[in-house]
Amino acid sequence: MFSKQVTDSPAYKWFDERLEVQALADDISSKYVPPHVNIFYCLGGITLVCFLIQFATGFAMTFYYKPTVTEALASVQYIMTEVNFGWLIRSIHRWSASMMVLMMILHTFRVYLTGGFKKPRELTWVTGVVMAVITVSFGVTGYSLPWDQIGYWAVKIVSGVPDAIPFVGPFIVELMRGSTSVGQATLTRFYSLHTFVLPWFIAVFMLLHFLMIRKQGISGPL
């Protein structure tokens, strides 16, 4: 995997002696890839790339976004009109969000149609389904952050859906909104979910997902 010039360097030997870098590199580069693998098996990787773009562009916007009902929309407009390349960063964030959802759906169909969810890969499928739910949650929480008319009413409708559940419905609605009505507490909760809670959850399940794929390998043809 590494050139002879690199492996002969003192720095490489120092790290290899302590961390067995060469053994790790050999394991990565020698992993068997079935001959039936085609471009459709790259959809999961493309979904990951979209997530990384989301993370980078979202992190950049947190420097300027203000999660308050009075300043949220103005801060988004400031990003779009005043911040250098802010319009591009936010546009890429929106485009990659749509692309991530699309790639996730296509990846799910590919895995289902090729039987990649069958024994012994049931847990890999379960972690993928959990990540799909988290991805949709990203979309719901992120859609509200500009706190414009569309975002406000989207939050009001989405957070009101659980109200139809017997007994616990009103409790869930108040838990989501942070109050009996949609307001600052709701925006704060959605912002916290979108920028902190959900990224940690999806990172953990991604790690589990990739470790299981690494251990079990790519599923064979039907």
UniProtKB/Swiss-Prot annotation:
Q: List the Pfam families.
A: Cytochrome_B
UniProt entry keywords in alphabetical sequence: Electron transport, Heme, Iron, Membrane, Metal-binding, Photosynthesis, Thylakoid, Transmembrane, Transmembrane helix, Transport
Q: What is its main location?
A: membrane
User: Membrane-spanning residues where?
Assistant: 39-59, 97-117, 123-143, 193-213
Annotated positions binding heme b 2: 93, 194
Its Gene Ontology biological processes?
A: photosynthesis; respiratory electron transport chain
Membrane topology per the record?
A: Multi-pass membrane protein
Known CDD domains for this protein? Cytochrome_b_N (cd00284)
Q: What NCBIfam families does UniProt report for this protein, alphabetically?
A: PRK03735.1 (NF002990)
What does the function comment of this entry state? Component of the cytochrome b6-f complex, which mediates electron transfer between photosystem II (PSII) and photosystem I (PSI), cyclic electron flow around PSI, and state transitions.
Assigned protein family: Belongs to the cytochrome b family. PetB subfamily.
Q: What else is known?
A: Heme 1 (or BH or b566) is high-potential and absorbs at about 566 nm, and heme 2 (or BL or b562) is low-potential and absorbs at about 562 nm.
Read off the PANTHER family from this record.
CYTOCHROME B
Protein name (Swiss-Prot/TrEMBL):
Cytochrome b6
Q: Which organism is it from?
A: Trichodesmium erythraeum (strain IMS101)
Its taxonomic placement starts with:
Bacteria, Bacillati, Cyanobacteriota, Cyanophyceae, Oscillatoriophycideae
Q: Which gene encodes it?
A: petB
